[in-house]
């Protein structure tokens, strides 16, 4: 019973993170020190968009690392979420960055505050 409860608490935490951060990256490590090549490439693509983004280091949050793939229906990390929607992982993000779609998406999600 206890384990099931903690599982639903983790799912609630994931939902809250996704809902409260317009642009959110679940990654291994942090943007300054990514702990895998896929996370590093995704961070680079996001940084090139020139907007701030939130991140969750799944290596320091093993319970999120365990639950998020099932919640997202996406098995791998990193995962980029924009406005509550899963955009995808490294391959998708890199491709979107190359064709300009990523910047368009991020700019639309985070309009300049001036």
Task: List the predicted regions and their residue ranges.
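Short, Lys/Arg-enriched N-terminal segments with co-localized hydrophobic residues
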Residues: 1-6
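Eukaryotic intrinsically disordered and solvent-exposed regulatory patches
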Residues: 10-12
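Local sequence-structure signature of Cys/Sec-based thiol-disulfide redox active-site neighborhoods
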Residues: 15-52
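Acidic beta-strand-to-loop metal/phosphate-binding motif
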Residues: 26, 79-83
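Thiol-based oxidoreductase modules, predominantly thioredoxin-like and allied folds used
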Residues: 50-66, 75
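A short, glycine- and basic residue-enriched loop/turn
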Residues: 74-77, 90
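Non-catalytic, surface beta->alpha helical segment in thiol-disulfide oxidoreductase systems
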Residues: 82-112
């Amino acid at each position: 019973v206890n384990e099931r409860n903690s599982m639903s608490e983790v799912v609630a935490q994931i939902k809250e993170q996704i809902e409260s951060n317009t642009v959110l990256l679940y990654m291994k490590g942090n943007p300054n020190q990514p702990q895998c090549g896929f996370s590093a490439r995704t961070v680079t693509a996001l940084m090139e968009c020139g907007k701030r983004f939130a991140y969750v280091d799944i290596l320091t949050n093993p319970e999120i690392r365990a639950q998020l793939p099932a919640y997202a229906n996406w098995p791998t990390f990193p995962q980029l979420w924009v406005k509550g929607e899963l955009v995808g992982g490294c391959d998708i993000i890199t491709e979107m960055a190359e064709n300009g779609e990523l910047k368009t998406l991020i700019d639309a999600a985070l309009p300049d505050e001036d």
